Every structure is written in C-alpha cells, then in structure tokens.
Amino acid sequence: MGAQWKVKHKEAAANAKGRTFGKLSKEIMIAARAGADPDMNSRLRLVVEQAKKASMPRETLERAIKKGAGLLGESVNFERLTYEGFAPHRVPVIVECLTDNINRTVSEIRVLFRKGQLGAAGSVSWDFLYQGMIEAVPAAADADPELAAIEAGAQDFEPGEEGATLFLTESTDMDAVCKALPEFGFTVQSAQLGYRPKSTVDGLTDEQMAEVEAFLEAIDNHDDVQNVYVGLAG
C-alpha cells in the first residue's frame, strides 16, 4: 500500500464506485468555485481528469461543475478537515474529509478511530511527504519515463497501475508538470495532491492485516471521507 488506501475486494470495490463519484463531485464543486472553465481553472481541470478516468457520467460531472460555480442557484458549503492517527498495530493514517456539518463529522470520525488511536495534528504527518501524484500513460512505445520526469520537472517516478507511470512532484509544481508531460510522450490520466509515507509498517500477520484493512474500510466508507493515506507495506 504505502500511500492512498484503496478497496481490494472486487465486490467492495464495485460498491465503492458510487461513493467515488460522490467524493469526486464534492472536489469538482469546490474547485468550480473559482470558475467553471477547466481551461482557465487548473485545479478544476485536474479534478475533471480524475473524474473522467473514474468513468464519471458526463451529466453528473457537468452538474457538479455548474453547482459549484453557482450556476444552478444552489450554495456549496463544504469545509476541509484532516485527521491523523493510527490504525490497529500502530499503522499511521491520515484521513481527509469534506463536510457540510463539522460537528457531525468530528463525532463520527472519533467513534471510528476507537479501534485505533486518534492523534493530534502533526502526530503522524511528519512521517509523510505531501506531494503531487500524476498518473500518466505513454503516448508512444518509445516514451522514456526517466527523461520525461527530468525534463518535465518531476521529483521522481515509479511504475503505476496497468502500464501507467506515477510521476511524483513538489506540491507546487504539479500543474506545471502535468502541462509539460505531453511534450515528452506521456498522456496524463489523473493528478492529485496527497500524502506518501516516508516509512511503512511491515511484518504484520494475516490476522493483523485483516484488522487494519477492516479499520481502513470502515473509515473510507464514511460519506465525509475523501482520502485515506496509510503507511503500510504490501
């Protein structure tokens, strides 16, 4: 794992698709506050790319943009909250939320953390890097990820899923790297800012791993949770 936690089991992953669209809709609405045109709003453009990769229906995507931009006469009032703490067996976790009711979210997240340990701000984030994470696929067979990373200004790169490459950037450089990668033979599929662990917990037994995964799944299932980052090997 070692970064953003994702549902592993096929049935759970299928059920999670609707939640994924809900999470992306929130991000789109917030980004669209700064303008409904992705060409003029880099933050919105990046979230729209994520939504397209997730196969969000076009109608859902466009409605979220219009709602966030105030074109439907509805107000969007979400607040960002970040929680730090530990899953069972001292596995470090960072949880990002978007909520329209802070008191509700605080109360419910505290309950979910009873099987782990909720920490103070900074209790685990010191052991994570806040980075841009760009998933891109080669547009040509001879595209060189190392050359592309150097020339586009990425910090590093590593193999991604299904033949993609994950380019890692400084948080402030992500948009510039996204724009530069096509010049060096890569098509950007998604890009987001997030946390990557500097070190990970390993050596857990199957039973212990099952406890950690059950904890993470319960957190991720909460409607207000956007992202779960975990320092867990494997």
UniProtKB/Swiss-Prot annotation:
GO terms for biological process: regulation of DNA-templated transcription. One of its GO terms (molecular function) is DNA binding. The keyword NAD does not apply. The keyword Transcription regulation applies. It comes from the Bacteria. One of its GO terms (cellular component) is cytoplasm. Its main location: cytoplasm. InterPro entries: Integrase-like_N (IPR017856), TACO1_YebC-like_2nd/3rd_dom (IPR048300), TACO1_YebC_N (IPR049083), Transcrip_reg_TACO1-like (IPR002876), Transcrip_reg_TACO1-like_dom3 (IPR026564), YebC-like (IPR029072). It is found in: Cytoplasm. Keywords: Cytoplasm, DNA-binding, Transcription, Transcription regulation. Belongs to the TACO1 family. NCBIfam families: PRK12378.1. This is Probable transcriptional regulatory protein Psyr_3028. It comes from Pseudomonas syringae pv. syringae (strain B728a).
